[in-house]
Amino acid sequence: MRDVIRGRAWVFGDDIDTDQIIPGRYLTTQDPEELAKHVMEGADPEFPEKVREGDVIVAGKNFGCGSSREHAPIALKAAGIACVVTRSFARIFYRNAINLGLPLVVCPGVDDAFEDGQGIEVNLREGYVRNLDTGEELEAKPLPDFMMRILEAGGLVELIKREGPRAFEG
C-alpha cells in the first residue's frame, strides 16, 4: 500500500448507495472478477467499461449508504479502484471497505474540485487531495496508523494472519 495514490478521478454525487455500487441482482456471486464487471452500474451503466486499474472514485456525502454488503467494496477493489474520496461515508460501508483493504478518505468539498478524467493525487498519511490538472489542493482527514496497517496488509484478515494477536497491540 502506497501512502500516495495517483490516478484518474470519476465523480459521483451524494447518497451513492450499495445498490448503485453493485446492483442486487449480482449478489448471487462471490467472484470478485464477476462483481467488477458490474461495479457502479447503478449510477453509471457504462462505468465498468470506462474504469481502469488505479482510478479513484470521488463523490459527495453518504457514499455507501443502504444495505450492508461486502460485495460493494469487493467490487470496487476488484475493478481496480485505488481509493474512494468523498465528503462522507456511511459508517458500515467505511468499516467494510477498510477491513477489505480498500482505502477511503474523507475530504470536504472534493466533489466540487474534480471533473471526470482529471488527475488526482491522494496522500493517505498527510491528509491532502490534489487535482493534478488544476493544481487545487484540499485538506483531507489523514488515515490513522492502525488503519494504514490494515490497508498495508491487504485487509484485516490478512493483518491477523500475518501478525496474529499482535495485530491488536498498541
Curated annotation (Swiss-Prot):
Keyword Amino-acid biosynthesis: yes
Pathways per UniProt: Amino-acid biosynthesis; L-leucine biosynthesis; L-leucine from 3-methyl-2-oxobutanoate: step 2/4
Catalytic activity: (2R,3S)-3-isopropylmalate = (2S)-2-isopropylmalate
Domain of life of the source: Archaea
InterPro entries: Aconitase/3IPM_dehydase_swvl, AconitaseA/IPMdHydase_ssu_swvl, IPMI_Swivel, LeuD, LeuD_type2/HacB/DmdB
Top EC class, one word: lyase
Biological process (GO), any one: L-leucine biosynthetic process
GO molecular function, one term: 3-isopropylmalate dehydratase activity
Pfam families: Aconitase_C
EC number from the UniProt entry: 4.2.1.33
UniProt keyword annotations, A-Z: Amino-acid biosynthesis, Branched-chain amino acid biosynthesis, Leucine biosynthesis, Lyase
Similarity-based family: Belongs to the LeuD family. LeuD type 2 subfamily.
Assembly and binders: Heterodimer of LeuC and LeuD.
Function: Catalyzes the isomerization between 2-isopropylmalate and 3-isopropylmalate, via the formation of 2-isopropylmaleate.
UniProt xrefs under HAMAP family: LeuD_type2
Protein name, as recorded: 3-isopropylmalate dehydratase small subunit 1
Originating organism: Methanopyrus kandleri (strain AV19 / DSM 6324 / JCM 9639 / NBRC 100938)
